[in-house]
Amino acid sequence: MTAQTLYDKLWNNHVVREEEDGTVLLYIDRHLVHEVTSPQAFEGLKMAGRKLWRIDSVVSTADHNTPTGDWDKGIQDPISKLQVDILDKNIKEFGALAYFPFMDKGQGIVHVMGPEQGATLPGMTVVCGDSHTSTHGAFGALAHGIGTSEVEHTMATQCITAKKSKSMLIAVDGKLKAGVTAKDVALYIIGQIGTAGGTGYAIEFGGEAIRSLSMEGRMTLCNMAIEAGARSGMVAVDQTTIDYVKDKPFAPKGEAWDKAVEYWRTLVSDEGAVFDKEYRFNAEDIEPQVTWGTSPEMVLDISSKVPNPAEETDPVKRSGMERALEYMGLEAGTPLNEIPVDIVFIGSCTNSRIEDLREAAAIAKDRKKAANVQRVLIVPGSGLVKEQAEKEGLDKIFIEAGFEWREPGCSMCLAMNADRLTPGQRCASTSNRNFEGRQGNGGRTHLVSPAMAAAAAVTGRFTDIRMMA
């Protein structure tokens, strides 16, 4: 039998039918639903007189529009409130395996809530009307975002039409240095291959450095696969995966668990499996990263300087660099560790889990917010993450440092709720996109790890965390 990649196995196990041109009907195991991309899909079902094909495949929460402060005031923005209210109504009418509404303890960012509930399991196909659905590939699952029309198709038929991507292996060999996190690995990879480097591919991440990551670190890495242009990212199943899933609310139990684990252990690329493209990186080459421009690929080590467009020979790239520097208000040659920040945001589906908050708290402990930093928002990814952080006293560390301890939600990752930048504000952010206006009109976003964000909060500028005792 021909050796298969992990992607081959996941794909082949879910093909319902294949056409001559390679288009397939792909069966979907788990459908994650939130308030932004579902209203039109539910309306389409109503107009056609259809029901959900499989109610028990749907797990839902409200996240993009929910406020992260003053919950006693409810949702103030009328459009945001309308979207959340419509989701409440649609789930009540159509049903779901589980729904975590606004202000429920289980509510949170969909890509945080799903894994912590055990709704994401190895071997599954997972879709959501959100591009960062690639997060769930960390479990040895095939996960990717879909558009609103595909959300309706999944609801109505439990299938989507798709064509198989090419396969890519990105291996990071060796051990990561102290202070280097999964976020740094993700940004480094994107800096090396570019935001189009993974276009048309499904990426499997491997190598010693990847295997050493916790599940939360792997989720951060796979979350960023879409920023490298890939539709999906994944990590093979190992004991770390199995230990994380065990005893989660929706994980199999008893004999079903034993059978599931037996299957899950096969979800690795076979020896001799051939990938369409491979990259290998040395973990020791990776330093703490900071983006300087308006694309995740515009990223450098913290010890670097803002690049000079005049040194770029490609006229298209040079023009892009010039535009980015103008938007970001930066001068070529400025050391990254001399760039001051106005706002710090620690949260998002990339970096809002308990390990991320511990990482930030370790830097913030016994320190205070720098005088030039206007606000520091700490936004846990879910109510359960918030609860755990408070049990550990992390909230007190943040509050004593002068940071804001918020309620769960997508928050300042994107300007769809009350948390947003104003024109010209510079933000050290643990989110996934630094596009123009992503965090608010005219806002300037620098992507970093939680520890690097916390360091910027207490020093007032981008700082190498390895220099902080």
Curated annotation (Swiss-Prot):
Domain of life from the UniProt record: Bacteria
Cross-referenced InterPro entries: 3-IsopropMal_deHydase_lsu, Acnase/IPM_dHydase_lsu_aba_1/3, Acoase/IPM_deHydtase_lsu_aba, Aconitase_4Fe-4S_BS, Aconitase_4Fe-4S_dom, IPM_dehydratase_rel_enz, IPMI_cat
Pathway: Amino-acid biosynthesis; L-leucine biosynthesis; L-leucine from 3-methyl-2-oxobutanoate: step 2/4
Keyword Protein transport found: no
Molecular-function GO term, any one: 4 iron, 4 sulfur cluster binding
Keyword Nuclease among record annotations: no
Keyword terms of this UniProt record: 4Fe-4S, Amino-acid biosynthesis, Branched-chain amino acid biosynthesis, Iron, Iron-sulfur, Leucine biosynthesis, Lyase, Metal-binding
EC number annotated for this UniProt entry: 4.2.1.33
Cofactor: [4Fe-4S] cluster
Example GO biological process: L-leucine biosynthetic process
Reaction catalysed by this enzyme: (2R,3S)-3-isopropylmalate = (2S)-2-isopropylmalate
Coiled coil location: none
Cofactor note: Binds 1 [4Fe-4S] cluster per subunit.
Binding site for [4Fe-4S] cluster: C349, C410, C413
Xref: HAMAP family: LeuC_type1 (MF_01026)
Annotated function: Catalyzes the isomerization between 2-isopropylmalate and 3-isopropylmalate, via the formation of 2-isopropylmaleate.
Family: Belongs to the aconitase/IPM isomerase family. LeuC type 1 subfamily.
Assembly and binders: Heterodimer of LeuC and LeuD.
Name of the protein this chain belongs to: 3-isopropylmalate dehydratase large subunit
Organism field: Neisseria meningitidis serogroup C (strain 053442)
Name of the coding gene: leuC
